[in-house]
Amino acid sequence: MNDYNHYFHFPREEWRKLEVSKDQILTAEELEEIRGLNDRISLQDISEIYLPLIKLIAIQYHEAIFIHGEKMEYLKKKESRAPFIIALAGSVAVGKSTTARVFKLMLDRWFSKTRQVELVTTDGFLYPNKVLEERGIMDKKGFPESYDRDRFAKFLTDLKANKEDVEIPLYSHFTYDVLDETRVIH
């Protein structure tokens, strides 16, 4: 059976029965703290949906690390840690940010802080408002043409190439604009 040719659909009742050996790893207070405005997510959702998904992500992560190690050994290259990137996509206001914060917190705990988990939003890769105005596309903010795709591609390339310090542009939800500041991940 080739897993890459199969997509699976699990009804919630079936999905929630998947065994996960971890205890509940979020409290009601933590969930409330990371929940976005109008997001409907409960501790039951965390237990029945997110926890099995985190377990599946952990399985995929360990498989990717094993394959990377085997490849480095075969190529007689010094083994370096390859990043494992998870991307979330969806339309506006569907809960991507809340899901990302839940993932980060749960993955931090799943790996007992032995792996660095970073949360990177694409907001920082938007063109600054000034550029959007100059190009007459301010009304397209958030659409593909409003993103600095070259900067985003360079970020991903640097990340995958294991560059020591990778800069992430920052975005302010107070000014609704890209900041001059960056954050560095190692």
Tell where the protein language model's regions lie, with residue ranges.
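Extreme N-terminal, non-catalytic leader segments
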Residues: 3-85
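Conserved nucleotide-sensing/catalytic segment adjacent to the nucleotide-binding pocket
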Residues: 35-49, 118-121, 125-175
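Short, glycine/charge-rich beta-strand/loop segments that flank catalytic centers
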Residues: 72-75, 85-91, 119-123
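Short acidic, glycine/Ser/Thr-rich loop/turn "cap" segments at secondary-structure junctions
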Residues: 83-91, 134-141
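Glycine-rich phosphate-binding P-loop
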Residues: 86-105
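Short, well-ordered alpha-helical packing segments
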Residues: 104, 108, 153-156
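Post-Walker A helix-loop "phosphate-sensing" segment adjacent to the P-loop in P-loop NTPases
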Residues: 105-118
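ATP-dependent NMP and nucleoside kinases share a basic, alpha-helical "lid"
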Residues: 176-186
